[in-house]
């Protein structure tokens, strides 16, 4: 789903991830709030960051970077790893890496629950990180029976993940939004309403309503907006933890070879050759860890 190339929900207790290259994308690691210990990230720009529970680490690989990961302490990392595509005009931009602490992110608290604005802009609040292209990342909880609206502009795609609990999802067009504020506490929704007859989807259950789906824990779906609209997220009789990632689709070819993502074979070959020639740099050796 453009602009995402890869999404991985991981539980990590070891070992270290050896130094490896990236080019043509941003690599993003979001550690969820129940993470224990930390993740140390070193790169060929001589950055050294230590991400902890709730933190976001964003590496713009651009024209090329090498980085490696090491666990810190008695670690049990619960997080998401994203590869976010860069449009062709940004694939040659200089690499960089940024660590955003969880306490720096806006947190919206209401009767419906709470949501962290990890990246992008939501409900008038801006996350602190300026990303190469706008990308919305929300890490939220819904109380039983509550719902939340998330705008989805025309031309954007969204990836929605039920990290915990059962999550209902309804698509609405902007021309007919429900006459309620963006965040609401709704009446408790009986669990039976989340089990309508309908065709089963690969990662969730589809209701008879084609604009409504149910995600069991660990399932995800994607949505595409051909015009401005909303996604309405609903919890039934138990709390629901969701992660939403949304951004504008990149209407360009994608050619991938592992950590290299380009728009054509020639650019891909050039990126691999640049890495093999040492143009991405290398990690400096420290504490006996090879670079």
Language-model region placement:
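Jelly-roll (double-stranded beta-helix
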Residues: 1-291
